[in-house]
Amino acid sequence: LSGLSFREFLELETGYKFPVYSFEEIVEHHEEIVNDILEKVRPLAFFNSYLKYGYYPIYLEEKSHIDYLLKNINLTLEFDIPYNNQIELKYLTKLKQLLFIVVNGNSNINISKLSAQIGVSRATVLNYLHYMKNARLLTLLFDRESDDENGLKPNQVFLHNPNLLNAVCLDQTDSLMVRKTFLISQLCAVAKLNFSGNEDLFVNQKYEVSVRQQGGKGRGWDSVILMTDLIERGKKNV
């Protein structure tokens, strides 16, 4: 099930229509773009609601969005992934265990450690991660030099969108992880994302992106785009 972007969520909530911009257009013209948006709506007033339940349009009908998400996560793990990838039912607990460990740990992963933790081979761990990526439970980030992701070891793993974080993560206080997950979920459908190594993301083989929270400032390099929250207007590379 494809989800709503924050732009689409704002359109549903406010009744306004907003243009679609490429990542490059936002980087180059965000100071002008935001003027048009703020004439109609204050996006920050809707941001936390989107993080909690706005990705899936079912929120318009389903009040208990957490129960809905948990039900669909289980359906995906117990039926969709095993059916599409010929996984024997006896291995379902391994699949669920891997998801739980990955999403409640650091986004940087160690395949050998995961293999030992759930008791399967490294190749099986990689397969399971790719299966969950294809099922839109996870997003995998690979080295910036990688052209073909099939079968490769990811450098980082994130849940597919922040609503899933709200449903399955034990630690609800890691706001930086929420912001990173949000940004990745917005970009992955429209841009090529890679693990940067230097910063948080390498976008379209060109842009170094660093994620900050609560208006925090980065190192101020012109070559690095700073993505921060809780501000209505950015300036230059922020």
Feature annotation, model-predicted:
Residues 1-95:
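Interdomain motor-coupling "hinge/lid" segment immediately C-terminal to the ATP-binding subdomain
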Residues 4-8, 165, 231-236:
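A short acidic, often aromatic-flanked loop/helix-cap motif at beta-alpha or helix-coil junctions
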Residues 14-17, 154-155, 237-238:
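Short, surface-exposed amphipathic charged segments that create phosphate/polyanion-binding patches used
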Residues 20, 183, 187, 199-217:
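Conserved catalytic cores of phosphodiester-cleaving nucleases, focusing on short active-site segments
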Residues 47, 153-154, 221:
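A structure-centric signal for secondary-structure junctions around beta-strands
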Residues 55, 206-207, 238:
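Well-ordered beta-strand scaffold positions
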Residues 57-199:
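Accessory nucleic acid-recognition modules appended to NTPase machines
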Residues 194-198, 213-238:
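Catalytic cores of nucleic-acid endonucleases
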